[in-house]
From Swiss-Prot:
Cellular compartments per GO CC: DNA-directed RNA polymerase complex
Protein's name in the database: DNA-directed RNA polymerase subunit omega
Organism of this sequence: Ehrlichia ruminantium (strain Welgevonden)
Function: Promotes RNA polymerase assembly. Latches the N- and C-terminal regions of the beta' subunit thereby facilitating its interaction with the beta and alpha subunits.
Enzyme class at the top of the EC tree: transferase
InterPro entries: DNA-dir_RNA_pol_omega, Pol_omega/Rpo6/RPB6, RPB6/omega-like_sf
Record note on quaternary structure: The RNAP catalytic core consists of 2 alpha, 1 beta, 1 beta' and 1 omega subunit. When a sigma factor is associated with the core the holoenzyme is formed, which can initiate transcription.
Biological-process GO terms, alphabetical: DNA-templated transcription
Domain of life: Bacteria
Enzyme Commission number(s) of this protein: 2.7.7.6
UniProt catalytic activity: RNA(n) + a ribonucleoside 5'-triphosphate = RNA(n+1) + diphosphate
Amino acid sequence: MARLTVEECMGRTNNKFKLVILASQRAHDLNSGASPVVKHKNSKNTIIALTEIANEQLDVHLLFNLAVQRCRKYMEKFINSDDSYVVHKSKDNIDIFQKNATSNFDELGANSLNVENSKFLDGDNFFLTQKE
């Protein structure tokens, strides 16, 4: 059943990786107490999420924006953390991820947390819509 659902979902996005982002955000919402919009019989939340996406019962743009906001909140906590690993690490020994994340966050500033104004993973063909 999951393989069929994934194939059906591919009509809503233009690649599998974007589908994973959408399904994981919806599964996170379901785990947090959101009500499913499809009937299910003891299905796992990942299958419910994929089914909702395949049945076009969710706004994929809104779902993606929620995923971006969740990621940004996590990154903001990481960057502003008082974790001794980050604070006491020598300047010569900063890993590439930390260096890039910190510099990009500082360059973007506070206005970058607004999803509507950002270009985070934005593209002309990010989502394919089926309008026939």
